[in-house]
Amino acid sequence: DKPHFILTTNGDMHLELSGFDPACVWEIEGTFTHLLQGKQPDNKQDVVNSFLSRYTGKRLVVLELGIGSRNRIIKQPLMQLVEHEPNATYITLNLPHELYIPEEIAGKSIALPGDIATILVDINICMEGMHPHAETDSTGKR
């Protein structure tokens, strides 16, 4: 497990229901439950800032999963973060027509076009092949 924090504009609480720690998730626009109850969205900006301050100057990955190309609520501040952090990398998984990487961070970015579920399965298969405990034959090859 790596330290992480998740920003999302989804309001369905699926991340929490999938086992992610609610303290590490910020549904920026609130949840449907909050909306139905007339509550304001939680503001975890201070939590995000505290998390990011611990990694200033260190290796940092911003992983974007399926954020529409026009959604600037999350994309813009994270892209600016990557631009200003020397050891940050921006990785985006999205449908080809939704991929957007500005020129300022193009050299620090990876775009993976396609269906997110398929891409994640493919990455998992590749990672399993690189696992140090994978079975090897008598020549030491996997």
Where are these regions (language model features)?
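Conserved catalytic alpha/beta core of Sir2/sirtuin-type deacylases, generalized to analogous enzyme cores
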Residues: 1-142
